[in-house]
């Protein structure tokens, strides 16, 4: 996994996306991880599949939580910036630099919100693959 969610910069959306891409590595490699760590029938006694699945589940949950916090923190930060800029625009509606900056921040906010949808798809895919391979070995705690 990459940087903790509080270390992720929200200023540059392209950089933020790149950091998310790196943070999603565990999800991208889940099939490979399961294939290399879960035993086949012939090796079933040599590896504790329950423990392996539990560790993978905990890693996935940590990654999902970290990314979710980073995205939501950046959304909150950008929303605040948009609100401030909107207030300034009301006072100075002819300032083109201000209008341009406001549009830029509004676009960034829209893109950040779309990352929440991407995150949902990535998480659902990982859970599905995890459940297909680990359901017999490990039952994750119920989500509230």
Swiss-Prot record:
Covalent S-S links between cysteines: none
CC per GO annotation: mitochondrial intermembrane space; mitochondrion
The keyword Flavoprotein is annotated on this UniProt entry: no
Coiled-coil intervals, chain numbering: 82-120
Keyword line: Coiled coil
InterPro entries: MIX23 (IPR019171)
PANTHER family named in the record: COILED-COIL DOMAIN-CONTAINING PROTEIN 58 (PTHR31905), PROTEIN MIX23 (PTHR31905:SF2)
Similarity comment text for this entry: Belongs to the MIX23 family.
Protein name: Protein MIX23
Organism from which the protein derives: Xenopus laevis
Native organism taxonomy: Eukaryota, Metazoa, Chordata, Craniata, Vertebrata
């Amino acid at each position: 996994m990459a940087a903790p969610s509080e270390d992720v910069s929200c200023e540059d959306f392209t950089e933020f996306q790149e950091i998310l891409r790196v943070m999603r590595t565990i999800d991208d490699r889940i099939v490979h991880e399961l294939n290399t760590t879960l035993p086949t029938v012939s090796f079933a006694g040599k590896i504790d599949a329950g423990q392996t699945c539990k560790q993978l589940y905990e890693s996935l949950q940590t990654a999902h939580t970290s990314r979710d916090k980073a995205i939501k923190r950046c959304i909150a930060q950008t929303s605040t910036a948009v609100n401030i800029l909107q207030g300034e625009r009301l006072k100075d509606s002819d300032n083109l630099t201000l209008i341009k900056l406001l549009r830029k921040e509004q676009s960034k906010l829209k893109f950040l919100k779309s990352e929440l949808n991407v995150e949902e798809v990535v998480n659902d895919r990982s859970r599905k693959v995890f459940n297909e391979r680990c359901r017999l070995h490990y039952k994750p705690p119920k989500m509230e």
